[in-house]
Amino acid sequence: MNSTNTVVYIKVKGKRPQGFLDPPKFEWNGTKERQLWTMVSNLNYSQDQIDWQNLSKIFETPEFFLKKRTYKLFAEHLELLQLQLEKKRDLEKYSNDQVNEGMSDLIHKYIPTLQNDNLLNVSASPLTTERQDSEEVETEVTNEALQHLQTSKILNIHKKTSDSENKPNDKLDKDGINKEMECGSSDDDLSSSLSVSKSALEEALMDRL
């Protein structure tokens, strides 16, 4: 509808102008309205405008009324189409929300969340484990070496005690000389036991490695 194919009638109070004719009386019903909509809604795109004169003859209705009803029918169907589009969009949104909720439920159900207990139960890293093993080996080897050293000292002390008990009491001078010699021997034995303990420590370390 535009200014070339549309006529607007305005009703004003006053005398009728000369030559004015009252619009003809006509009958309009739902059947004619459905037929009108079928005709105007199935127009070919190549057709520029509606042939209102032909439609007026078919329906025996004035052109202005047909134009008004056609405009009203298009407006109603456009509004209905808009409602359908909004409804479809709402349904798609609701469906997507349901899908998201379903995925969230699956995630919470089948993928356990990380708890503090899990953090506490995390196994140590290989570097930490290796460091702990090395410290344990060093401690064990050191204890073993100290045990060897202590044993050698005890043997040496026991040997000195038994030798001194077997000697006569009247040979004190010789005992003094022997004690000095035994002290030197004890120092040598201690040095020897230390070297033996050192060798045992090295052998234990090599065995551990």
Curated annotation (Swiss-Prot):
Gene Ontology biological-process annotations: autophagosome assembly; protein transport
Localisation per UniProt entry: Preautophagosomal structure
Key word Protein transport present: yes
GO cellular component annotations of the record: phagophore assembly site
Predominant localisation class: other
Residue ranges, annotated region (Disordered): 156-198
InterPro entries found in the cross-reference section: ATG29, Atg29_N, ATG29_sf
Phosphoserine: residues bearing it: 104, 185-186
Cysteine-cysteine disulfides: none
Amino acid composition bias (Basic and acidic residues), ranges on this chain: 160-182
Pfam families for this protein: ATG29_N
Alphabetical keyword list: Autophagy, Phosphoprotein, Protein transport, Transport
Functional note: Plays a role in autophagy. Functions at the preautophagosomal structure (PAS) in order to form normal autophagosomes under starvation conditions. Also plays a role in mitophagy and regulation of filamentous growth.
Subunit text: Forms a stable complex with ATG17 and ATG31. Interacts directly with ATG31. The ATG17-ATG29-ATG31 complex interacts with the ATG1-ATG13 complex. Note=The interaction with the ATG1-ATG13 complex is induced by starvation.
Family according to the record: Belongs to the ATG29 family.
Protein name in UniProt: Autophagy-related protein 29
